[in-house]
A protein has these predicted regions:
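C-terminal cap of metal-dependent C-N hydrolases
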Residues: 45, 398, 410-453
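Disordered, low-complexity segments in secreted/periplasmic proteins that are enriched in proline
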Residues: 33-34, 111-126, 450-476
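His/Asp/Glu-enriched, well-ordered alpha-helical/loop segment
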Residues: 106, 120-125, 129-130, 141, ...
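N-terminal secretory signal peptides that target proteins for export/translocation
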Residues: 1-11
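Bacterial N-terminal signal peptides
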Residues: 11-26
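Polyanionic/metal-chelating signatures
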Residues: 148-299, 430, 436
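Histidine-rich, glycine-flanked metal-binding segment
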Residues: 34, 38, 47, 51-93, ...
Length: 476
């Protein structure tokens, strides 16, 4: 005879299983999806929160991708993997406020796809939408996160140097598209995006499409776009409220996005590198009442007080002007150009002195070591190390509107940290560990975290955080 549970007994077993599942669902997750630990504690370290005073012999606890606790007397969860930070300094992860990491390179289009309206115009990349005939170089609906490639080999080198977040920008255009703020953490783009619509990039270079083919034409075109957007902004809600008897306005995705811009819901990056571009950008931003950051800022040394008076923020391009590697012997640089090369690294110090908030962009620099070399040029020209660190961390986060989650070491913020053996911008400093979204990347085979409950440093193979360069000579 077969035995079977009675209905009551079956219901009882189901109830027990359901209760067990509920308890498990509320238990702490000790490992991430990839089998990596979710809890860490860095102990006995010097901690530079940026938002507050430096802490000596302190601990920072990471739980489920977030900073759980920071301080000298912090309880360490029993499930945490521990890193002895003696002799090490913990900084917030660095933010590169403007780069093309992970972005596709523009490829020449077939001859048949050459620009409109002008004989011999340059090829237009096939993946870039030129828009309708009257909207050349205009694609504000493009979002960098949609094109982001996490397999870009530069991402690892940036991360090993201490960069945990980057504002990746679309290729240039008049209204090129929206930059995205990306954490340099995983292989899945969807898990890396901090803010997909982080900043709209504006360009003032004439297009290769035939129209507009001059700076004056570009500015006139932008004025037309803003005027069209203002009309759309008024017509669309009117029609939505009372459609009967009113001609339906055309749906225009450029104007839909630009409406958000005119309502200051997103920051706009205006090209503003020299003494001509900076005043122009400030005038246009004021004319259209845009939430703006000046992008470039290398001649800020000459206009710092004016920028401060207008209360604009700046993203400084760290790719300082320099002489060509193989210059034409007949092309003798002007005194103005030589002066620019000499004084550009002094712009961050001038901006800081004037009270201008600024961030740093790698701006096309090929190697992280050159980023830090150029930061040292700025500090040699008068910028303090503290101001340089803020430009890469909290000030960058504030400019980009994410200071509630990035830029400093505080409980509740994303666990983006860099652990080094000295001054982060020192020429001989070595990065030892990097955390991005709480994920551990070990840069140097030293001070391995030990398993919860153990005093040693051994870990099972399946729990070893992803390792990077073993020699620790990174980004200097």
């Amino acid at each position: 005879m077969k035995l079977r549970l009675s209905g009551a007994a079956s219901y009882g077993r189901v109830a027990i299983l359901a209760l067990a599942a509920l308890l498990l669902s509320h238990a702490p997750r000790l490992r991430a999806e990839g089998g990596e630990p979710r809890y860490f504690a860095i102990t006995n370290a010097r901690i530079v929160p940026v938002s507050g005073a430096v802490l000596e012999n302190a601990t920072v606890v990471i739980a489920n991708g977030l900073i759980q606790a920071v301080g000298a007397n912090v309880a360490i969860p029993p499930e945490a993997w521990v890193i002895d930070g003696k002799g090490l300094t913990v900084y917030p992860g660095l933010i590169d406020a403007g780069d093309d990491l992970g972005m596709p390179k523009q490829e020449p289009a077939p001859v048949a796809a050459r620009g409109r309206g002008r004989r011999g115009a340059a090829p237009v990349p096939e993946h870039i939408s030129m828009g309708p005939e009257d909207r050349p170089g205009t694609s504000p609906w493009r979002v960098a996160a949609d094109d982001f490639n996490p397999e870009d080999k530069r991402i690892e080198s940036w991360r090993e140097a201490g960069f945990t977040t980057a504002l990746v920008l679309p290729e240039e255009g008049i209204i090129a598209g929206q930059g995205s703020l990306i954490d340099l953490s995983s292989e899945r783009p969807s898990q890396m995006v901090v803010r997909s619509h982080a900043a709209l990039r504006i360009g003032l270079h004439p297009t290769t499409f035939g129209f507009p083919d001059s700076l004056m034409g570009v500015i006139s075109y932008l004025r037309q776009v803003t005027d069209d957007t203002a009309w759309y902004d008024a017509a669309a809600p009117t029609y939505a409220a009372h459609p009967n008897g009113i001609e339906r306005p055309n749906v225009d995705r450029t104007e839909e996005i630009m409406s958000l811009i005119l309502h200051r819901q997103e920051i706009v990056l205006f090209p503003a590198n020299d003494i001509v571009e900076i005043p122009r950008a400030m005038r246009l931003a004021q004319e259209w009442n845009l939430h703006t950051a000046l992008y470039g800022g290398q001649q800020g040394y000459a206009l710092a007080d004016q920028i401060a008076a207008k209360k604009y923020q700046v993203i400084v391009n760290l790719k300082w002007p320099e002489a060509a590697k193989d210059p034409d012997p007949e092309n003798i640089p002007s005194l103005r150009e030589l002066r620019f090369r000499d004084r550009a690294p002094g712009s961050p110090a001038a901006l800081a002195k004037a009270g201008v908030k600024f961030a740093f962009s790698s701006g096309g620099i090929a190697e992280p070591r050159d980023i830090f070399k150029n930061v040292r040029k700025a500090t040699a020209a008068g910028l303090s190390s503290d101001a340089a660190l803020r430009a890469f961390t909290l000030d960058a986060a504030e400019i980009l509107g994410v200071a509630d989650r990035l830029g400093s070491i505080e409980p509740g913020k994303i666990a983006n940290l860099v652990v080094a053996d000295g001054d982060l911008f020192g020429e001989k400093t070595k990065v030892k560990h990097v955390f991005v979204d709480g994920r551990h990347f070990e840069i140097h085979e030293i001070a391995k975290p030990h398993k919860p409950g153990d005093s040693g440093g051994e870990k099972p193979d399946d729990a070893t955080p992803q390792a990077s360069d073993a020699d620790g000579e990174v980004g200097r």
